């Protein structure tokens, strides 16, 4: 069974095309015109073992907000499409990732109900020209469009780059876990029979 999706989003603010293979090898080709986001998406693909291609153009002359948020929307939609009815998947995933002085933990439930818990203190407002508050916008958009519970907690950390990198890596690993097929699971992992 192929667990792939291609999603396009065209608005007056952005044009995005994203292709995703959940059962990939961690290969990425990302060009968003937002260098820090490119870096985060590349490592997201690598650590989740997803094949990911993203091509995005946006109104970055204003700021990165629309581009970052819309990529979160499209990635959430692609994950949701690729998972189909979620038959046989584990549903839950959790990962803790250290990066030097930082420790981030992410828990995921592919429940069909969107909720983001974001307990991340960022000691700076920018990494280069990237507004770090946009990370939350990305995670919220992904959460809403994947329709998942995602809890992101940073226990400690001082370097804002390390903090966000650990969050993206932990999310990737938690999603990899949650999306894995388990041969013991018949149908979906719910007593309701539907996710």
Swiss-Prot record:
Keywords: Amino-acid biosynthesis, Cytoplasm, Histidine biosynthesis, Lyase. The keyword Cytoplasm applies. GO terms for molecular function: imidazoleglycerol-phosphate dehydratase activity. The keyword Cytoplasm applies. GO terms for cellular component: cytoplasm. One of its GO terms (biological process) is L-histidine biosynthetic process. Gene3D superfamilies: Imidazole glycerol phosphate dehydratase, domain 1. It catalyses: D-erythro-1-(imidazol-4-yl)glycerol 3-phosphate = 3-(imidazol-4-yl)-2-oxopropyl phosphate + H2O. Its EC number is 4.2.1.19. Pathway: Amino-acid biosynthesis; L-histidine biosynthesis; L-histidine from 5-phospho-alpha-D-ribose 1-diphosphate: step 6/9. Its main location: cytoplasm. InterPro entries: IGPD_sf (IPR038494), ImidazoleglycerolP_deHydtase (IPR000807), ImidazoleglycerP_deHydtase_CS (IPR020565), Ribosomal_Su5_D2-typ_SF (IPR020568). PROSITE patterns: IGP_DEHYDRATASE_1, IGP_DEHYDRATASE_2. It is found in: Cytoplasm. It comes from the Bacteria. Belongs to the imidazoleglycerol-phosphate dehydratase family. NCBIfam families: PRK00951.2-1 (NF002111), PRK00951.2-4 (NF002114), PRK00951.2-5 (NF002115). This is Imidazoleglycerol-phosphate dehydratase.
